[in-house]
From Swiss-Prot:
Functional note: With S4 and S5 plays an important role in translational accuracy. Interacts with and stabilizes bases of the 16S rRNA that are involved in tRNA selection in the A site and with the mRNA backbone. Located at the interface of the 30S and 50S subunits, it traverses the body of the 30S subunit contacting proteins on the other side and probably holding the rRNA structure together. The combined cluster of proteins S8, S12 and S17 appears to hold together the shoulder and platform of the 30S subunit.
InterPro entries: NA-bd_OB-fold, Ribosomal_uS12, Ribosomal_uS12_bac
One of the GO BP terms on file: translation
Entry superkingdom: Bacteria
Organism: Buchnera aphidicola subsp. Acyrthosiphon pisum (strain APS) (Acyrthosiphon pisum symbiotic bacterium)
Subunit structure comment from the entry: Part of the 30S ribosomal subunit. Contacts proteins S8 and S17. May interact with IF1 in the 30S initiation complex.
Descriptive protein name: Small ribosomal subunit protein uS12
Family designation: Belongs to the universal ribosomal protein uS12 family.
GO terms, molecular function: rRNA binding; structural constituent of ribosome; tRNA binding
Modified residues annotated as 3-methylthioaspartic acid in this record: 89
Length: 124
């Protein structure tokens, strides 16, 4: 236990928690414009062509975001919404694109887990 004198000389320091998604600031999502849409390969031992895009956010940040789901309609200058959430096998990709909002369409023919891919409930 520190004495009052010791605390006067050197106060207790709070731990600073570093954000995993600095480009979002304190927001849950941010809007941005696609500057480049491309595919990239994951780290070992995985193998695929993962769809990603560079996004210029409204706050000036430029980040790489992952496009989840099968097929997409994004191209350069598409306006999209991004959320936090990294992709473990793609280094530097710390954001996901929100499907079914703004210019990004939902996943076609999706029947299960629809809310994560921006798909409305199908008609009976």
């Amino acid at each position: 236990m520190a004495t009052v004198n010791q605390l006067v000389r050197k106060p207790r320091v709070r731990k600073v928690i570093k954000s995993n998604v600095p480009a979002l600031g304190k927001s849950p999502q941010k809007r941005g414009v696609c500057t480049r849409v491309y595919t990239t390969t994951p780290k070992k031992p995985n193998s695929a062509l993962r769809k990603v895009c560079r996004v210029r956010l409204t706050n000036g940040f430029e980040v790489t975001a992952y496009i989840g789901g099968e097929g997409h309609n994004l191209q350069e200058h598409s306006v999209i919404l991004i959320r936090g959430g990294r992709v473990k096998d793609l280094p530097g990709v710390r954001y996901h694109i929100v499907r079914g909002s703004l210019d990004c369409a939902g996943v076609k023919e999706r029947k299960q887990g629809r809310s994560k891919y921006g798909v409305k409930k199908p008609k009976k």
